[in-house]
Structure formats: C-alpha cells, structure tokens
Amino acid sequence: MAKKVVKTVKLQIPAGKANPAPPVGPALGQAQVNIPSFCSQFNETTKDQMGFVIPVIISVYEDRTFTFVTKTPPASDLLKKAAKIESGSANASQTKVATITHKQVEEIANLKLSDLNAYCVEKACKIIEGTARNMGILVKD
C-alpha cells in the first residue's frame, strides 16, 4: 500500500543554496520534515544549476518522510539571462529593455517544454514570447 501524502509544499529556492533559514525552514517545519536532510538533498540535486531559482514541489508523507520534484527555472529568469539584464521593464508596453533572437526563445522553449502547457515547440515559443513581451524584451528574427 502506498504512503499517504499529508501535505504538499511548493517553494522557489536558489539552486544549491537551500538552508534552514526562511522561507525553507518555516515551510518545512510546519510539515514536520527533517529540514537539514531536505537541504542537503536539494543542494546536491541542483548544484549544476547554480545562479537560477528552482521551483520545487515537496510531498510530505504521514510518517514524516518526503520526496521532492524540481522543475525548470522560471521563464523570466531564463529570459533575463539570455538578454543579459537584471530585471524586466517597469512599463513593458512603452519601454523595451533588451532584444533577444527567435533562436534564443526556441532554446528556452525546448528547456521549458516539460513544464509548459504546450505539446509542441512552436506553441511553447509563443508562451515564452508572451513572457518576454510582458518583461519589455523585444524578440527579433
């Protein structure tokens, strides 16, 4: 018989930098999870993605054990890295802060395809282009 999930915790944690301080400690403490164990496992899993914020979904079982699934970094983080900017535009419709190529959008879409609500790369590209547009990033061919 499978273990019963009693709580699901969703967090966004910098890759390789999980520690018991907020937001990780309080969120997992409420679920009565072994926090140092989670931090070491998460840091080991994400050490090759340093510099990105990694979404993680933690399933806590009734015997206080846990499993977690890491997702791909948010599209906005990937777009900022591709455009070499610190943040998006405060007024995206009027001010464009950077330009990226369609090829860069396609690379990001391929990376994010498993987490997006799309079945093909073309549709995933449209989703990424929409995110870029909302950040004030212009997509050129």
Curated annotation (Swiss-Prot):
Record GO terms (molecular function): large ribosomal subunit rRNA binding; structural constituent of ribosome
Q: How is it modified after translation?
A: One or more lysine residues are methylated.
Signal sequence segment = none
Pfam families in the record: Ribosomal_L11, Ribosomal_L11_N
Q: Which UniProt keywords apply?
A: Methylation, Ribonucleoprotein, Ribosomal protein, RNA-binding, rRNA-binding
| GO cellular component labels | cytosolic large ribosomal subunit
* InterPro entries with a match to the protein in the record: Ribosomal_uL11, Ribosomal_uL11_bac-typ, Ribosomal_uL11_C, Ribosomal_uL11_C_sf, Ribosomal_uL11_CS, Ribosomal_uL11_N, Ribosomal_uL11_N_sf
- GO biological process terms on file: translation
Family affiliation: Belongs to the universal ribosomal protein uL11 family.
HAMAP family the record matches: Ribosomal_uL11 (MF_00736)
Describe its function: Forms part of the ribosomal stalk which helps the ribosome interact with GTP-bound translation factors.
Q: Which NCBIfam families match?
A: L11_bact
Fill in the subunit field for this protein.
Answer: Part of the ribosomal stalk of the 50S ribosomal subunit. Interacts with L10 and the large rRNA to form the base of the stalk. L10 forms an elongated spine to which L12 dimers bind in a sequential fashion forming a multimeric L10(L12)X complex.
This chain's protein is named Large ribosomal subunit protein uL11
User: Gene that codes for this?
Assistant: rplK
